[in-house]
């Protein structure tokens, strides 16, 4: 099973990814669950991550780097783990690229999808989109990088992107709303209820 967590910065993706991984490790065993992230997940991608998050590069160049990193991530980590019957949980994946690069920066959505098809990216089985008020999310965000320096209008576009993805793909995507009014355990229990 391949599960991803999506949402704007400060929505709690990293926390919920870790909580779900720990939940499955208790059930399936430590070695049967893989927790990973994007950008990142492989040695190559982790090196490029620092460049992406701290440098302002052209939006198409950034898209191509993200897709290259994702292909490497799929081939070296995600697909082998899934082939071994492991549960893979990823903090961000393809939907973040669509929301941030497409909706936020205005890169053509068709181009983003076509490039992912070209490099044979597998979509997750389940995606949890953690929906939070933009201002609250930005106040909660822990990692300060170039994206946190973007204005509220940018994040409103990104949030709208995630919401539209969920509308277009209701079987794969499950939206957890009102994150700003719930504690981490409440959100985690909501996620567990949706999986079982």
Swiss-Prot record:
The keyword Metal-binding does not apply. Its EC number is 2.7.4.9. CDD domains: TMPK. The keyword Nucleotide-binding applies. ATP binds at residues 7-14. SUPFAM superfamilies: P-loop containing nucleoside triphosphate hydrolases. It catalyses: dTMP + ATP = dTDP + ADP. Keywords: ATP-binding, Kinase, Nucleotide biosynthesis, Nucleotide-binding, Transferase. GO terms for molecular function: ATP binding; dTMP kinase activity. GO terms for cellular component: cytosol. InterPro entries: P-loop_NTPase (IPR027417), Thymidylate_kin-like_dom (IPR039430), Thymidylate_kin_CS (IPR018095), Thymidylate_kinase (IPR018094). GO terms for biological process: dTDP biosynthetic process; dTTP biosynthetic process; dUDP biosynthetic process. It comes from the Bacteria. Phosphorylation of dTMP to form dTDP in both de novo and salvage pathways of dTTP synthesis. Belongs to the thymidylate kinase family. This is Thymidylate kinase.
């Amino acid at each position: 099973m391949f599960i991803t967590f999506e949402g704007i910065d400060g929505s709690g993706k990293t926390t919920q990814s870790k909580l779900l991984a720990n939940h499955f490790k208790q059930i399936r065993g430590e070695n049967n669950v893989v927790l990973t992230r994007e950008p990142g997940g492989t040695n190559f991608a982790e090196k490029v991550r620092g460049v992406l998050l701290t440098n302002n590069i052209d939006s198409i160049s950034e898209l191509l780097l993200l897709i290259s990193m994702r292909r490497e991530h799929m081939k070296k980590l995600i697909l082998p783990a899934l082939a071994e019957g492991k549960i893979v949980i990823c903090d961000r994946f393809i939907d973040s690229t669509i929301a941030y690069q497409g909706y936020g920066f205005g890169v053509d959505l068709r181009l983003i999808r076509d490039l992912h098809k070209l490099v044979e990216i597998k979509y997750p089985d389940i995606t949890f989109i953690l929906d939070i008020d933009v201002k609250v999310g930005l106040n909660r965000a822990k990692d300060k990088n170039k994206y946190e320096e973007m204005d509220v209008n940018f994040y409103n576009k990104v949030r709208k992107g995630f919401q539209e993805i969920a509308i277009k793909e209701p079987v794969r995507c499950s939206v957890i709303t009102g994150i700003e009014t719930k504690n981490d355990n409440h959100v985690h229990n909501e996620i567990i209820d949706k999986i079982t």
